[in-house]
């Protein structure tokens, strides 16, 4: 069972270094109503946005940074998302003939299997090497709040930083 081995190794690593690892990292999720699910270094930018939003508006926003994609931690992730009203799944790549990116497909499946009712949207970012900013994440959280209030999701996915002609 790969999940068991991953957690055992994470525990050993924590005992050696004091650094905690697992399937994913949760940031300010203890009371979050709106969450971003992401993989990679853009999570640092998202953390800055979360701190700014919480400090200036008091909105309860959080982040889940995926560390292990296979085996996908569907039950654990569904538990972490069980109390949010809306979630944004951030992908850096698209999949052909699909309505989401690779991470989006996995997170949606996990939420569906757990019968979670949160509104969900998939965002594609960083295409063409473009950076994602704190302001971009602030807009994502604003959109999540609107989705949760209106129960209207304008499309299953959207693009951030895409240059239009």
Task: Show which residues each predicted segment covers.
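Solvent-exposed alpha-helices and their adjacent loops that cap or buttress functional pockets
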Residues: 27-31, 79-81, 112-114
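Short helix-loop-beta junction
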Residues: 8, 16, 48-63, 112-113
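A structural-propensity feature for long, helix-poor, extended segments
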Residues: 76-98
